[in-house]
Curated annotation (Swiss-Prot):
Molecular function terms from GO: DNA-binding transcription activator activity, RNA polymerase II-specific; DNA-binding transcription factor activity; phosphatase binding; sequence-specific DNA binding
Natural source organism: Mus musculus (Mouse)
Disulfide bonding pattern of the chain: none
Disrupted-gene phenotype: Mice display no obvious defects in development, hematopoiesis or T-cell function. Deletion of Axud1, Csrnp2 and Csrnp3 together causes partial neonatal lethality, suggesting that they have redundant functions.
Biased composition, class Basic and acidic residues, residue ranges: 480-492
Compartments reported by the entry: Nucleus
UniProt-recorded name of the protein: Cysteine/serine-rich nuclear protein 2
Lineage of the organism: Eukaryota, Metazoa, Chordata, Craniata, Vertebrata
Tissue expression from the record: Highest expression detected in thymus, brain and ovary. Low levels detected in naive T-cells.
């Protein structure tokens, strides 16, 4: 008996259904008792029947109140709300605590009812516009007082002037803000005789407080003067100096500081999209993998993952905030940009010329795009090539370009250790005075006619030295070039443009001249041996 009463109490606490009552449970129990008594008097004929215990009775499903075949509308009376904040004035609208009527519609009936209500609202709105136009016409846009205009009402506007039958009501918005006079009229029509006037002042204070956002601090927050710190809230920075103007290092708010980080948001978005796309690819490739395993599936997924990571990094780089960019720029200026410029120039074959040239595409296929700079680079650049004489005869349009005319070229290799330059016949050391004197330059002077273009057809011939040709650079130079053989090993230049293809006027072919000191070159010098665009 105790177990029976306990189970009954448990059902009352578990079942929240309003429709269930004690009589239903009593009926169920009485029917089950009668069934048990019948079974005891008349034993079942089938042996498979097993009586179920009342303690393991399944919980009844709650009846759902949501139905998708009909719409139930509850109607409430209007009251002064005290819960909403209008954009102006007081007398906020609300509704009563209990509804006064209920009505059910089918889906089609509700759609028709909504259309009728919308057309009626639209008709009233057009009447108000028509009445306002008549008043403005009588008062000449408000410049003249008119007694007739003051006496006009909505009843003076005929319904024949308003046609809303052929208007598509879905193109209009019907939840429009109401002015204060209209709200007060609706409240009086609903039976509200006394409207609280103090609500107007409260709503005004709320609107003023909402206009003030953040603190007025600039770069530095004093906890005793900061409005956010006095209110016990964190300073918030959505963008530069908005709404709080404090900086990251100058904020003294004891509650803390929150800064919107677009990089973090973008990173989270890209990671989420990446995970979803990888999961979808795995689901698509899973049936194919069960039938026939693919050896390159894992590598393709790894490649896709790396592509997503690269895209993520690229997107993050473009989302740097202004404050972070300024900080990075200051750090770069403090550390010095000469080293980064030198390292970037060492990885490129740079050709410096005094005049802009139209370089053909077949000049040097080894380089993706020849770089032509009309300026001087700081010390540490790899190879500098420019014309010594700025006075060149103008090349005709049909002849070869101006950079292939006769004229000496100078190749420089800037090194960290002192190197004696090549001396001319006059005994004076050659070298441009415009470069700094901390680093000596190794100079090789060649005529322009000794250079040939690195065409695709000549790439095989350029990679092999010709048999019987001397490897010395001076034998390829003209006799009037004025260069002398270095007397000692110390005077011999440590770098020669061996990878630069050239030819003399009396040679038919061209070959790459390998210097004797190629074995002594460092890895840095060997990396610089690229065909240069001249």
């Amino acid at each position: 008996m105790d177990a029976f009463s306990g189970s009954g109490l448990k059902r009352k606490f578990d079942d929240v259904d309003v429709g269930s009552s004690v009589s239903n449970s009593d009926d169920e129990m009485s029917s089950s008792d009668s069934a048990d008594s019948c079974d005891s008097l008349n034993p079942p004929t089938t042996a498979s029947f097993t009586p179920t215990s009342i303690l393991k009775r399944q919980k009844q499903l709650r009846r759902k109140n949501v139905r998708f075949d009909q719409v139930t509308v509850y109607y409430f009376a209007r009251r002064q709300g005290f819960t909403s904040v209008p954009s102006q004035g007081g007398s906020s609208l609300g509704m009563a605590q209990r509804h006064n009527s209920v009505r059910s519609y089918t889906l089609c009936e509700f759609a028709q009812e909504q259309e009728v209500n919308h057309r009626e609202i639209l008709r009233e709105h057009l009447k108000e516009e028509k009445l306002h136009a008549k008043k403005m016409k009588l008062t000449k846009n408000g410049t003249v007082e008119s007694v007739e205009a003051d006496g006009l009402t909505l009843d003076d506007v005929s319904d024949e002037d308003i046609d809303v039958e052929n208007v598509e009501v879905d193109d209009y918005f019907f939840l429009q803000p109401l002015p204060t006079k209209r709200r007060r009229a609706l409240l009086r029509a609903s039976g509200v005789h006394r409207i609280d006037a103090e609500e107007k002042q409260e709503l005004r204070a709320i609107r003023l407080s909402r206009e003030e956002c953040g603190c007025d601090c600039r770069l530095y927050c004093d906890p005793e003067a900061c409005a956010c710190s006095q209110a016990g809230i964190k300073c918030q920075v959505d963008r530069m100096s908005f709404p709080c103007g404090c900086s990251r290092d100058g904020c003294g708010n004891m509650a803390g500081r929150i800064e919107f980080n677009p990089i973090r948001v973008r990173t989270h978005y890209l990671h989420t999209i990446m995970k979803l796309e990888l999961e979808s690819k795995r689901q698509v490739s899973r049936p194919a993998a069960e039938e026939e395993p693919l050896p390159g599936a894992q590598s393709s997924q790894t490649q896709d993952f790396q592509e997503f990571i690269a895209e993520n990094e690229t997107a993050v780089m473009h989302l740097q905030s202004a404050e972070e960019l300024e900080r990075l720029k200051a750090e770069e200026d403090s550390s010095g940009s000469s080293a980064s410029l030198d390292s970037s120039m060492e990885s490129l074959g740079v050709c410096i010329l005094e005049e802009p040239l139209a370089v053909p595409q077949e000049l040097c296929p080894g380089l993706a795009a020849p770089i032509l700079i009309q300026a001087q680079l700081p010390p540490g650049s790899s190879v500098l090539c420019f014309t010594e004489n700025s006075e060149h005869p103008a090349a005709s349009p049909m002849s070869s370009p101006s950079y292939l005319n006769s004229g000496p070229l100078v190749y420089y290799q800037v090194e960290q250790r002192p190197v004696v330059g090549v001396k001319a016949e006059s005994g004076s050391e050659e070298g441009p005075a415009s470069f700094p004197k901390e680093k000596d330059l190794s100079v090789f002077s060649l005529p322009v006619t000794s250079l040939v273009a690195c065409g695709p057809s000549a790439s095989a011939a350029l990679c092999k030295p010709e048999v019987g040709k001397t490897s010395s650079l001076n034998k390829l130079l003209p006799e009037d070039c004025g260069l002398k053989e270095p007397e000692s090993e110390d005077l011999h230049p440590s770098w020669s443009p061996s990878s630069l293809p050239f030819r003399t006027d009396n040679e038919e072919g061209c070959g790459v001249q390998n210097s004797q000191q190629s074995e002594d070159r460092t890895s840095e010098d060997s990396a610089l041996e690229l065909p240069l665009a001249v």
